Structure formats: structure tokens, C-alpha cells
Amino acid sequence: MLSFETTTPGGPLAAVESEIPQPQGSEVIVKMLACGVCHSDIHMHDGVFDLGHQKQLEVGRPGMVLGHEIFGEVVAVGPESEGAAIGDRRVVYPWIGCGECASCLRGDENLCTPGRALGIAAKGGFAEYVSVPHSRYLFDKGDVSDSLAATYACSGLTA
């Protein structure tokens, strides 16, 4: 599969060929149909968040596959996967937690500090395929366009 990975802060993304992920356990493989570019993708690419008052937070690293505003089609499901079928077209909720910390255990994965957020801690949507840990992170887009649905994965589902 083709993905686009970060190289150096502010540098060009590198086109990288790799194997298409194969689902394990409850994982779901989604083929990208649309992926938004969020302002945080720009920060991760540039390697720094401007915190204001001349303060910055260094972020990002070489080899990241950015993109957390994901919309795609389910193309494979793991043997333990339930709730997703091949051919389903879904928005992917990217704020995936570790599953073990206090935030995750009370159902607040979006507040998980270690986290496994797609496009940040795990490979994201700037690729042909993305591995989603469980079908619970997939949502129907309703009647909006594919490209608009992708942008809902960040601000729309967390609002």
C-alpha cells in the first residue's frame, strides 16, 4: 500500500510502499475514500505547536503517517470482529485510548494520555489503508458527502 510519512520538521512527506495490513482479533481494515487535513496535522508535520506567549511544544517525529479525519470502506475484518461488514462505508473515530488507564476504564478514551490516536500515535489516513482496533470506532456518515464526513472524525464526533 502507499502511505505518506513525515521526514523532517516542515519537510516533504515521503511516499512509502508497504504491505496492506491484515486484521487480527477485532481489528477492521478500512480503505481510504477521503481524509481531511486538520490544523493539528499541520502542527505535527511542522514539528511544533505554537502555545502562544512565545512558548512552543515540540511534537511529531519522522515516519509518522498523519491524518485523523478518516472516511473509508471496510475491506477486511478480524476473526473476532463484530459490528462491521465488508463494504460498510464509515467515518473512523480516531481518538483511541490505551484501554487500561483510568480515563479509558471510565469510558473517556479521548482523555487517555498514552493513547493510540490514529494519525498521531498510530498510522493514520494519509495512506491507502488504515487498521482500526475495533468496529466501535466506525460511524455512519448519514447523508453528507464523503469528504465532509471525513472532517467530522475530529471536531464533529468530539464536540
Question: Where are these predicted regions, by residue range?
Answer:
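NAD(P)H dinucleotide-binding glycine-rich loop of Rossmann-like/cofactor-binding domains
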Residues: 56-68, 98-159
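Short loop segments at secondary-structure junctions
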Residues: 9, 33, 75-80, 109, ...
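Well-ordered beta-strand positions enriched in small/hydrophobic/aromatic, beta-favoring residues
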Residues: 3-4, 90, 130
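N-terminal glycine-rich cofactor-binding segment
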Residues: 3-22, 39-76, 112-121
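A generic structural signal for well-ordered coil/turn residues at beta-strand boundaries
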Residues: 14, 24, 86, 125-126, ...
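Short, small-residue-rich loop/turn micro-motifs
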Residues: 36, 46, 134
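Glycine-rich beta-strand-centered segment in the early N-terminal region that forms part
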Residues: 21-35, 50-102, 142-144
